[in-house]
């Protein structure tokens, strides 16, 4: 969704480009990806390669970003 993308945009601000894992509550995997993977493609266009993982420990509507160490 657009709201999720805006939250993601704020979280990525200032982060170095690279690969990472976006942890979301399992019910929010589809929302995090966006319609036709729009949110993932948006991030890719800005230099971030993100994979989404369902994680019961993450509150619904929230997310956690873990970037791979280079």
Regions from the PLM with identified roles:
Residues 1-70:
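Auxiliary Fe-S-binding modules of radical SAM enzymes
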């Amino acid at each position: 969704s657009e709201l999720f993308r805006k939250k993601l945009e704020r979280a990525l601000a200032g982060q170095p480009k690279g690969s990472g894992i976006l942890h979301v509550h399992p019910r929010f995997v589809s929302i995090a990806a966006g319609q036709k993977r729009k949110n993932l493609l948006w991030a890719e266009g800005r230099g971030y390669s993100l994979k989404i993982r369902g994680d019961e420990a993450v509150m619904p509507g929230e997310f956690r970003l873990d970037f791979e160490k280079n």
